[in-house]
């Protein structure tokens, strides 16, 4: 017969509790073969017989302070029809006999120690020497003579006590788990300001995932662990490889040693996951930057991504006599651990050289009459000066590339410059407008191209090429200059910085609003011939040879 400690009254966590059990009267009586004899029937009675006092029962109390939970020995003492098992002033069970029927009842009062920690439902038996505890049947005939017989109840495991183990389970409602680190760290070369080197799943949030119970044996301990299934487990994350077109490097794989899981690739450690086995707190520590595939967002995040059950956080509940039970939550399949990107920085230098490029119409190719020594149909914003306008940084993901472009807002954009029209009183012709095709912006009017602006996308050098002369309104100065003049932001030079995993950032300087590109005039030339004169002015080609007063 057995009782089971999984009782609500004892704090049991199981559902199979049994508070009392009996050796039935029928079974007890069937152990014997009495006869009254010639004097006829008198009576039959039953009793328990315990030899001695404070008799060791082979059972023990539970002591949470002891490593294996084994407490004081439970001893037996008898008073009348009741034998009580007790230790340290606490009663653990009773054996009671009905003296008339022989029924014996085992009543469980408190839980006892069970040494088998591999089975939370194991049983231990009351264990005494042969003949120490017996059940006695006494037969009395009609004139009072009596005889007795006994069966042993202590040496054969008659009375058993089944264990109650702890319960480990998940809470019905629990806070979500999440930890995010950010690569924008000085230690990683990051340029952002929101870097996060480590993040945790707090002990409180971890513990709130579970609903443990120690059961009837009382509190032992609760511990936590990470469980990774396999070695070199693909994490769904990648290293950064500047040599790859999209920057995606080798797969980062996971391996566990004790309480630490490390994500690594090619001999480089990228992050660790560490658990505090006492509290359950899990810390994600970022050691190096990982690849992010979204090139449209320099602050996107990627998640550690594993199959269901590959990475779990385990809570193990151990009761006072060493039985344990475990429950687990998944940490790999739900985007719990995230890694935010660091993008490049594009900005302007605090101090930079001024930008300017001037061409001069006093060119033979344009019929110029001037003799400017430095006349040229081409002028450049040098690569060095252009690059000095900016202050780029690649950030934690490392160097990708730097490129340059011209950006013109709109089409047929008024340049502030004009063609020359000899038919107009002041020579001002049609407005020269700007249009862009690729790396070239062309200024044209009436089907005639007057100049081009061309950028070298690799170096940033911008070349102004003069194709035809433009109108100059200052008639008092034959060598005056006019500037390309646009609204702020209409024509800009853009530097685009791209890091190793494809994120990009841009900065720009204005080229249209600050007189960067200038066009110097060519004036007429006066020749003295026979007391008279003639003049030539490229801005008035119809008047290339006019007589003037002698």
Where are these regions (language model features)?
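Acidic/polar, solvent-exposed loop/turn segments
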Residues: 1-550
């Amino acid at each position: 017969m057995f009782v089971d400690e999984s009782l609500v009254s004892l704090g049991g966590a199981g559902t199979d509790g049994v508070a009392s059990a009996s050796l039935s009267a029928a079974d007890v009586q069937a152990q014997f073969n009495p006869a009254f004899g010639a004097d006829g029937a008198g009576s039959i009675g039953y009793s328990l017989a315990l030899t001695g006092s404070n008799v060791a029962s082979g059972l023990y109390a539970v002591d949470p302070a002891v490593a294996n939970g084994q407490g004081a020995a439970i001893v037996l003492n008898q008073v009348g029809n009741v034998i009580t098992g007790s230790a340290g002033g606490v009663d653990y069970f009773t054996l009671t006999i009905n003296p008339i029927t022989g029924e014996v009842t085992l009543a469980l009062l408190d839980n006892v120690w069970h040494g088998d920690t591999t089975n939370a439902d194991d049983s231990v038996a009351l264990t005494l020497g042969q003949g120490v505890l017996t059940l006695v049947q006494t037969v009395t005939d009609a004139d009072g003579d009596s005889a007795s017989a006994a069966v042993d109840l202590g040496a054969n495991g008659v009375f058993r006590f089944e264990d109650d183990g702890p319960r480990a389970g998940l809470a019905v409602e629990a806070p979500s788990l999440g930890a995010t680190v950010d690569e924008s760290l000085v230690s990683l070369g990051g340029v952002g300001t929101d870097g996060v080197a480590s993040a945790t799943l707090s002990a409180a949030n971890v513990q709130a995932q579970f609903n443990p119970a120690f059961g009837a044996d009382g509190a032992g301990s609760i511990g936590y662990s990470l469980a990774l299934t396999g070695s070199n487990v693909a994490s769904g994350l990648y290293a950064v490889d500047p040599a790859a077109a999209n920057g995606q490097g080798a797969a980062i794989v996971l391996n566990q040693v004790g309480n630490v899981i490390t994500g690594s690739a090619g001999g480089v450690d990228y992050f660790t996951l560490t658990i505090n086995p006492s509290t359950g707190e899990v810390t994600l520590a970022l050691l190096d930057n990982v690849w992010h595939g979204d090139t449209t967002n320099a602050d996107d995040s990627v998640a550690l991504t594993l199959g269901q059950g590959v990475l779990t956080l385990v809570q193990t509940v151990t009761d006072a006599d060493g039985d344990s039970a475990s429950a687990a939550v998944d940490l790999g399949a739900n985007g719990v651990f995230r890694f935010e990107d660091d993008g490049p920085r594009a900005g302007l230098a605090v101090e930079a050289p001024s930008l300017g490029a001037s061409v001069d119409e006093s060119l033979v190719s344009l019929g110029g009459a001037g003799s400017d020594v430095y006349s040229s149909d081409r002028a450049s914003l040098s690569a060095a000066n252009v690059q000095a306008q900016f202050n780029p940084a690649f950030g934690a993901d490392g160097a990708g590339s730097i490129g340059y472009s011209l950006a013109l807002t709109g089409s047929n954009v008024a340049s502030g410059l004009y063609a020359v029209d000899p038919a107009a009183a002041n020579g001002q012709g049609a407005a020269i407008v700007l249009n862009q095709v690729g790396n070239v912006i062309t200024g044209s009017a009436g089907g005639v191209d007057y100049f081009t602006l061309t950028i070298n996308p690799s170096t940033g050098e911008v070349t102004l090429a003069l194709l035809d002369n433009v109108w100059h309104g200052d008639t008092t100065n034959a060598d005056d200059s006019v500037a390309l003049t646009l609204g702020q932001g209409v024509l800009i030079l853009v530097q685009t910085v791209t890091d190793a995993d494809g994120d990009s950032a841009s900065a720009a300087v204005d080229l249209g609003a600050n007189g960067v590109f200038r066009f110097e005039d060519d004036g007429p030339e006066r020749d003295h011939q026979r007391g008279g004169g003639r003049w030539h002015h490229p801005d008035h080609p119809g008047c290339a040879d006019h007589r003037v007063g002698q």
